Amino acid sequence: MAETSALPTGFGELEVLAVGMVLLVEALSGLSLNTLTIFSFCKTPELRTPCHLLVLSLALADSGISLNALVAATSSLLRRWPYGSDGCQAHGFQGFVTALASICSSAAIAWGRYHHYCTRSQLAWNSAVSLVLFVWLSSAFWAALPLLGWGHYDYEPLGTCCTLDYSKGDRNFTSFLFTMSFFNFAMPLFITITSYSLMEQKLGKSGHLQVNTTLPARTLLLGWGPYAILYLYAVIADVTSISPKLQMVPALIAKMVPTINAINYALGNEMVCRGIWQCLSPQKREKDRTK
């Protein structure tokens, strides 16, 4: 599939086109919403706070996922992977870094909100910066391991995008999967659920809770859970027994996460919405220039 435009096994012409169009819509929606979020942080002084730095980290990670989806969409519409084996490794690495950073940034936001609402103390800049650096360095570390031999990047069933190779299900993949999943999926999910549950217990009855305490955990579980199930199945059974089309479903679901996150963390936040509106408003920009 990387060298020719022949249809991949298990896919028809319309199915390849449909996957490409879905990826394109997901990429453009996620990229546009998260770019607006990033732009509002850069242009609105009120948003330059330690807590909002964590949201900015998430928006950057989700923008990276959307860019990865855009490359996959373009390749799907071309019906081939035009960037060679090195491009496949780079695409897999970039997608894995941003996916892990998105998951861990969501957990960091949950912890930051718990700190803000339940301890009634402001998150310090050095704590927020250290947390963001840890998220990205940790994500880069885990994403680099398949390039070094623990795990491996390869083409997805459609052959027009690259991800962690789960087709063999051997000891190398199994050991990497369980170790990586514990630190980058199970722990962030636990932190997210615990943080919002404690917030709900402490502030839910008082009516002072101003954030959605269920959507973030559901997004992590439903957005990335299908990948976890697919990978787990590859460990315990022959993954080729699953149709190639069904194997592509987790990738399509995961590419929706940036849009959902932008709606929840940015458009669902009154201050961020105001910042986006100020950036888009010609009158506001004119006032800023005359100050």
UniProtKB/Swiss-Prot annotation:
| Pfam families assigned | 7tm_1 (PF00001)
List of glycosylated residues: 172
Q: Which residues lie on this side of the membrane: Cytoplasmic?
A: 37-52, 113-130, 197-219, 269-291
Q: Which SUPFAM superfamilies match?
A: Family A G protein-coupled receptor-like
Task: Give a yes or no for keyword Disulfide bond in this entry.
Answer: yes
Q: Which Cys pairs are S-S linked?
A: 88-162
Q: How is it modified after translation?
A: Covalently binds all-trans- and 11-cis-retinal.
Q: Which residues carry this modification: N6-(retinylidene)lysine?
A: 255
GO CC list: plasma membrane
- Identify the residue ranges that face the Extracellular compartment according to the record: 1-15, 74-91, 152-175, 241-247
Where does this polypeptide localize?
Answer: Membrane
Q: Which GO terms describe its molecular function?
A: G protein-coupled photoreceptor activity; G protein-coupled receptor activity
Q: Name one GO biological process term.
A: phototransduction
Family classification: Belongs to the G-protein coupled receptor 1 family. Opsin subfamily.
Record-given protein name: RPE-retinal G protein-coupled receptor
Q: Please name the source species.
A: Homo sapiens
Gene that this polypeptide is encoded by: RGR
